């Protein structure tokens, strides 16, 4: 009897466990179906994203950004969020709970952005929907006649796409939603560069300058002729229309206020941007105070460097010396690029001491394209399209060499190249155990926090031995600390543009030109500037915690591998992962 009862109990237990296992598997399957449905929708509705993702089925068109399509998008993303909300988290593995949390954040942010009508401002102070299109062809194949015809059809679709963007900007103007007028002076250069008199002058004509050997003379001639017409009647026509709209309608009617809190969404909108770019629950006042404390700390370190070079004069006089003395500036674009390349190569040799895992993808050093350079930052990392044979690129701005100081170059190069964005993004792309949406995910607080932390790693790697270069590192760190002060100042405290320029110029050795372009960037891109320092402080805090907890067991290579080993994550998720790693190391 007891034996039968035991047998019955075991069968019931087995059945219960089997049922639980089935429920858990069903829940996991549903979660990954949500990921798949969202990914497919993104590919189907955004042909540019599809092209960069290596999916070339829609290479013959541009996206739709019509109000009808935006409404469809909002409805779809809300349905995805509803499905995510129904998932029973207890039925998921720990890793999939993290995946659920990250994806829910992404979708919620996407919904809120549409509801706040972010699509009515499709550009900021240095880039926008129109600025990268001339390089889109690099992500497209040109092996067959159909490949070329796809590109031709895409060029001819530019006017429709630009008209829809213009219609959205008109909606914005009528609702008080626009990029502030004060940052738009001279912005037309980013548009005008593509309004040319001949297809030969257009960057969009580049794919028609050469053809595969398999093409016969007749095919080449026909495609060239079609391409010439498509460039002029498609791309150039669209940019000319946008230029006319910008100069005669958008700029004259752009808002004269600065802060995000002055937009219809008010402080709620700025708080949304804070959450989006920091991934932490921080108030405006908390961020502002963190910034002020960091500014004071870094200023003390700067004063020590000034004393070490025995400079006779005030802090502002030292900054003026750095901004004006020719010894600190390259004499040619080639010289600046060579110096950046040399720094990058030096850092390559230091990586094995800091990381166990290194990416396979190489990267190059190149100038910022001419059409972007005048309003662009000092440098930026640009990754390759998925499936392309291109490397990553560290872009260095060679426009106006007298505002591109060499003393900042070590910090800039480590931030944008390695161990910064190139290493971080390339490792993420090679993580095979992550869902697809996380492989190319870029959360600003994590990414830019890592970039700034990478500048700090230069100290451990033997950089900044020259006191002026060390001051350059400090001025870059000070710059990011100032961002916490000025971003909150602009968007919540009523700071003026000149107030921000003055604050940057008084506290950093950035050239006045860069102080101005950076100020315009912060005005036009609320919240983004907060991500650097907030992210870096969190990574440093977690490293200090790990060192204290592990003592002699701490290995910086393992720590860095753990930070980068899950791709881009919200900072609270990163904290959980580091705490788990520390606990595992202890055991």
Say what each PLM segment does:
Residues 1-2, 23:
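N-terminal hydrophobic targeting signals that begin at the initiator methionine
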Residues 2-10:
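Bacterial N-terminal signal peptides that target proteins for export
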Residues 9-12, 139:
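General helical structural elements
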Residues 11-20:
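Bacterial N-terminal signal peptides
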Residues 22-587:
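N-terminal maturation segment of proteins
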């Amino acid at each position: 009897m007891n034996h039968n009862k035991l047998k019955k109990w075991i069968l019931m237990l087995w059945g219960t466990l089997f049922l639980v296992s089935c429920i858990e598997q069903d829940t996991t399957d549903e979660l990954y179906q949500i990921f798949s449905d969202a990914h497919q929708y993104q590919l189907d509705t955004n042909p540019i994203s599809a092209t960069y993702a290596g999916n070339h089925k829609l290479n013959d068109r541009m996206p739709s950004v019509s109000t009808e399509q935006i409404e469809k998008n909002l409805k779809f993303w809300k349905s995805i969020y509803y499905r995510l909300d129904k998932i029973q988290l207890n039925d998921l593995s720990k890793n999939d709970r993290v995946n659920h949390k990250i994806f829910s954040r992404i979708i919620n942010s996407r919904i809120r952005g549409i509801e706040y009508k972010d699509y009515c401002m499709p550009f900021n102070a240095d880039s926008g929907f129109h600025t990268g299109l001339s390089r889109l062809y690099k992500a497209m194949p040109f092996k067959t006649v159909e490949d070329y015809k796809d590109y031709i059809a895409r060029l001819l679709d530019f006017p429709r796409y630009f008209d829809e963007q213009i219609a959205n900007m008109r909606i914005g103007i009528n609702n008080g939603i626009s990029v502030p007028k004060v940052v738009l002076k001279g912005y037309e250069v980013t548009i005008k560069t593509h309004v040319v008199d001949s297809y030969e002058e257009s960057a969009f004509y580049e794919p028609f300058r050469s053809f595969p050997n398999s093409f016969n003379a007749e095919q080449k001639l026909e495609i060239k002729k079609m391409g010439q017409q498509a460039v002029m009647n498609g791309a150039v026509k669209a940019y000319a229309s946008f230029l006319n709209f910008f100069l005669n309608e958008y700029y004259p009617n752009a808002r004269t206020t600065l802060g995000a809190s002055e937009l219809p969404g008010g402080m709620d909108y700025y708080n949304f941007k804070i959450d989006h770019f920091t991934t932490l629950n921080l108030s405006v006042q908390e961020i502002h105070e963190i910034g002020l404390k960091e500014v004071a700390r870094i200023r003390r370190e700067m004063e020590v460097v000034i004393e070490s070079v025995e400079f006779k004069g005030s802090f502002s006089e030292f900054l003026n010396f750095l901004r004006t003395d020719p010894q600190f500036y390259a004499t040619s674009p080639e010289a600046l690029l060579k110096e950046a390349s040399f720094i990058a190569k030096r850092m390559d040799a230091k990586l094995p001491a800091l990381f166990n895992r290194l990416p396979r993808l190489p990267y190059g050093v190149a100038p910022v394209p001419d059409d972007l350079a005048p309003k662009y930052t000092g440098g930026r990392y640009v990754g390759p399209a998925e499936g392309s044979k291109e490397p990553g690129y560290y872009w260095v701005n060679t426009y106006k060499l007298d505002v591109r100081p060499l003393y900042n170059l070590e910090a800039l190069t480590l931030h944008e190249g390695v161990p910064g964005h190139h290493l971080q993004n390339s490792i993420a792309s090679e993580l095979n155990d992550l869902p697809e949406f996380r492989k190319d995910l870029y959360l600003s607080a994590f990414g830019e926090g890592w970039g700034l932390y990478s500048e700090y790693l230069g100290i451990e790697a033997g950089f900044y031995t020259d006191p002026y270069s060390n001051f350059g590192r400090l001025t870059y760190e000070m710059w990011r600390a100032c961002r916490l002060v000025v971003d909150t100042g602009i968007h919540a405290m009523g700071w003026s543009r000149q107030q921000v320029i003055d604050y940057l110029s008084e506290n950093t050795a950035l050239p006045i030109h860069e102080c101005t372009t950076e100020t315009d960037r912060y005005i036009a891109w609320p919240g983004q500037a907060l991500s650097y320092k907030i992210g870096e402080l969190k990574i440093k805090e977690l490293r200090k915690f790990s060192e204290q907890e592990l003592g002699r067991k701490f290995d910086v290579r393992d720590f860095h591998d753990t930070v980068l080993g899950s791709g881009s994550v919200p900072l609270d998720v990163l904290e959980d992962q580091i705490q788990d790693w520390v606990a595992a190391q202890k055991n």
